[in-house]
Amino acid sequence: MFLMIDNYDSFVYNLVSYFLEENIDMEIIRNDLVDLKYIEDLLEKGKLEGIIISPGPKSPKDCGLCNEIVKQFYKKVAIFGVCLGHQIIGHVFGAEVRKGKSPVHGKVHKIKNSGKNIFKNLPKEFNVTRYHSLIVEKENLLNDFNIEAETEDGVLMALSSKNYPLYSVQFHPEAVLTEYGHEMIRNFLDLAKEWRDKNANRS
């Protein structure tokens, strides 16, 4: 089962629907109602396959227990942050999260990506839809994270941890005008399974 941490966002059920189309089980929990012990229990019972941290209207400093979820579980289970979820991951690992030059709401921009991880087997450039006013500065992340995607003017659009199954995108993969949204979701599900399989073999 996958957990969707809902940051009180109007897009969350669009994102959920993309995941459910891949024939997975998913539970949705609001960011201030989630119980860390419940997540730990799911992990111990082998029931938790991954965590998705949804978009949301606020900031990483006002997101319920999301910061604690990332801190406590990023070494144990795959986590995928979307929009606010991306900013939360950056914030937890010491990045500056600040206002961009101007808000971008519903705008389509081209990104350049690594062709790896979330972007495996996808074109190196394609269009995504952005809804955000905050951006993550990459400078403090370079030791521990791969820069997976940026806009043409250098705004950070996606991250992955170098050592753990931690991934994030600033844009909305579930938006209609985002290209390859379903493929990115599938890639995350594959990455989550690879991590589970690798760690199961160790025990």
Model features per residue range: what roles?
Residues 24-34:
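A short beta-strand-loop structural module common to alpha/beta enzyme folds
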Residues 35-47, 140:
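Short amphipathic alpha-helix with an adjacent loop that forms part of the alpha/beta core around
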Residues 176-203:
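Acyltransferase
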Residues 117-163:
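Catalytic beta-strand/loop cores that center a nucleophilic Ser/Cys/Thr
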Residues 45-121, 185-187:
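Cysteine-nucleophile active-site neighborhood
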Residues 1-3:
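Extreme N-terminal starter segment of soluble prokaryotic enzymes
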Residues 11, 58-60, 176:
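Active-site beta-alpha loop architecture of Rossmann-like, nucleotide-cofactor-dependent enzymes
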Residues 17-25:
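Two-component/phosphorelay signaling modules centered on CheY-like receiver
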